[in-house]
Amino acid sequence: MFDFDGLSNAFSCQTVLCVGDLMLDEFVYGEISRISPEAPAPVIAVQRSEINVGGAGNVARNIAALGARCIFVGLAGEDEAGVRLRTTLSREGLIEPLLISDPARPTTRKVRFVSDHFSTHMLRADWETPAPASGVVEQALIDAILPQLPRADIVLLSDYAKGVLTARVIRDVIDAARGLGKRVIVDPKSANFGIYSGATLLTPNRKEFADATRSRADDQASIAAAAREVMRLVDGEALLVTQSEHGMTLVPREGEVIHVPAHTVKVRDVTGAGDTVVATLAVSLAAGADWETALRTASAAAAVAVGKSGTAVVTLAELRRKILPPAFLAAEEKIAQSTDDLDQRLSAWREQGLRIGFTNGCFDILHPGHVKVLTGARAACDRLVVGLNSDASVTRLKGEGRPIQDERARAEVLAALEAVDLVVIFEEDTPMNLIERIQPNVLVKGGDYSLEQVVGQELVTARGGEVVLIDILRGFSTTSLVKRAGGRA
């Protein structure tokens, strides 16, 4: 395991200059249960829709989500989609958008119709003019980009072949960046890799690579042979071929081929996962990572991204949780910050097929009896969520003078235990609402309760879950410890 904390601490000091094709991504979700009487076409009953910044704009948002600063240069039309994108990007604190207006073209917009039940894309509608930018707009792009190069730690070109990255823009940016000693990463669209000559790193997917090199690209040997020929022609330092569930293969100009397998995860939506990969690579390399560390970081980010719906960003906290096992996480990261935070973590665990357990209590003064129950609870599941009574709740249940420790202190002590994967503070006197939200596979309590006394047992068993009672250690209780301490005061 590499020092992720050491690397990620440097992310906030980096500035990435990102240039590429900006898009508006819209996802229309609904159910499909019938065929139209007017034509042999499915009818989607729309239930909700989402609009996100897409294309190179999604790259910029992923850079910012990791805590780095992004100077973003792109094109937008003078239309409603362009206004929406400008407004959204202007609200991103770590993104400095420099958008050139092109009244002659619409803002690229993609609308995807998705079956909500099956998470299947049924249809995509595109509004775009993929022709290269006009000479006037091309010059405006170059004039916007070149003055920003001295401020950047690394340059990222995100090419979707929608008109921004013309041959001239690419050439001028790469030449100027190399003159300043700046590394350039290119996520290419053109099959003519020669137009990216001088770039530090090219990151095609397997299909793009196979088309450009006319190779099979079906094993590491064929990828390496074709990649080294490409680097000889384009004067690059390395070429990375992303291969979805087959991982990533990086071929450096000198040295051994590096292959990083993909994480085993349930794929919900691959839209924008490539954006997440190149954004993470750029930030990691700018922060001083070597090739292998940057690849492993990007692979983990991709695993988080494909577990989300739509065009998604991956935050630094999410990436940290993916890379580091729960036992290595700092205590504060094992405390749910909101219901959304709780829901996201539960969703990620369920998508991995993990068995979720739940127990609860006040845990005012942690003692061996608590530890025995928590350890037993963790043994009965893959991830243990501990519901913790808030200060107000403890006072109502235990009386004045309690709790001895406030809820934050109690949560941090619990979170420091290896047996505990997540702590959730709740305000009610019982955890019934929390259990209903979590829907655990396993509900655990100490053996001083009978099955009928366990709050939420009906909910859990009705959904096919189980209730586990752990034998307690006699002679340990917080109340008795408080009394003994008071007697000695």
From Swiss-Prot:
<comment type="pathway">
    <text>Nucleotide-sugar biosynthesis; ADP-L-glycero-beta-D-manno-heptose biosynthesis; ADP-L-glycero-beta-D-manno-heptose from D-glycero-beta-D-manno-heptose 7-phosphate: step 1/4.</text>
</comment>
<keyword id="KW-0067">ATP-binding</keyword>
<keyword id="KW-0119">Carbohydrate metabolism</keyword>
<keyword id="KW-0808">Transferase</keyword>
<dbReference type="GO" id="GO:0033785">
    <property type="term" value="F:heptose 7-phosphate kinase activity"/>
</dbReference>
<comment type="subunit">
    <text>Homodimer.</text>
</comment>
<keyword id="KW-0547">Nucleotide-binding</keyword>
<feature type="binding site">
    <location>
        <begin position="205"/>
        <end position="208"/>
    </location>
    <ligand>
        <name>ATP</name>
    </ligand>
</feature>
<dbReference type="GO" id="GO:0016773">
    <property type="term" value="F:phosphotransferase activity, alcohol group as acceptor"/>
</dbReference>
<dbReference type="InterPro" id="IPR023030">
    <property type="entry name" value="Bifunc_HldE"/>
</dbReference>
<feature type="region of interest" description="Ribokinase">
    <location>
        <begin position="1"/>
        <end position="330"/>
    </location>
</feature>
<keyword id="KW-0418">Kinase</keyword>
<feature type="active site">
    <location>
        <position position="275"/>
    </location>
</feature>
<dbReference type="GO" id="GO:0005829">
    <property type="term" value="C:cytosol"/>
</dbReference>
<dbReference type="GO" id="GO:0097171">
    <property type="term" value="P:ADP-L-glycero-beta-D-manno-heptose biosynthetic process"/>
</dbReference>
<comment type="similarity">
    <text>In the N-terminal section; belongs to the carbohydrate kinase PfkB family.</text>
</comment>
<comment type="similarity">
    <text>In the C-terminal section; belongs to the cytidylyltransferase family.</text>
</comment>
<keyword id="KW-0548">Nucleotidyltransferase</keyword>
<dbReference type="InterPro" id="IPR029056">
    <property type="entry name" value="Ribokinase-like"/>
</dbReference>
<protein>
    <recommendedName>
        <fullName>Bifunctional protein HldE</fullName>
        <ecNumber>2.7.1.167</ecNumber>
        <ecNumber>2.7.7.70</ecNumber>
    </recommendedName>
</protein>
<dbReference type="Pfam" id="PF00294">
    <property type="entry name" value="PfkB"/>
</dbReference>
<dbReference type="InterPro" id="IPR002173">
    <property type="entry name" value="Carboh/pur_kinase_PfkB_CS"/>
</dbReference>
<dbReference type="Pfam" id="PF01467">
    <property type="entry name" value="CTP_transf_like"/>
</dbReference>
<feature type="region of interest" description="Cytidylyltransferase">
    <location>
        <begin position="358"/>
        <end position="489"/>
    </location>
</feature>
<comment type="function">
    <text>Catalyzes the ADP transfer from ATP to D-glycero-beta-D-manno-heptose 1-phosphate, yielding ADP-D-glycero-beta-D-manno-heptose.</text>
</comment>
<dbReference type="InterPro" id="IPR011913">
    <property type="entry name" value="RfaE_dom_I"/>
</dbReference>
<keyword id="KW-0511">Multifunctional enzyme</keyword>
<comment type="pathway">
    <text>Nucleotide-sugar biosynthesis; ADP-L-glycero-beta-D-manno-heptose biosynthesis; ADP-L-glycero-beta-D-manno-heptose from D-glycero-beta-D-manno-heptose 7-phosphate: step 3/4.</text>
</comment>
<dbReference type="GO" id="GO:0005524">
    <property type="term" value="F:ATP binding"/>
</dbReference>
<dbReference type="InterPro" id="IPR004821">
    <property type="entry name" value="Cyt_trans-like"/>
</dbReference>
<dbReference type="InterPro" id="IPR014729">
    <property type="entry name" value="Rossmann-like_a/b/a_fold"/>
</dbReference>
<dbReference type="InterPro" id="IPR011914">
    <property type="entry name" value="RfaE_dom_II"/>
</dbReference>
<dbReference type="GO" id="GO:0033786">
    <property type="term" value="F:heptose-1-phosphate adenylyltransferase activity"/>
</dbReference>
<dbReference type="InterPro" id="IPR011611">
    <property type="entry name" value="PfkB_dom"/>
</dbReference>
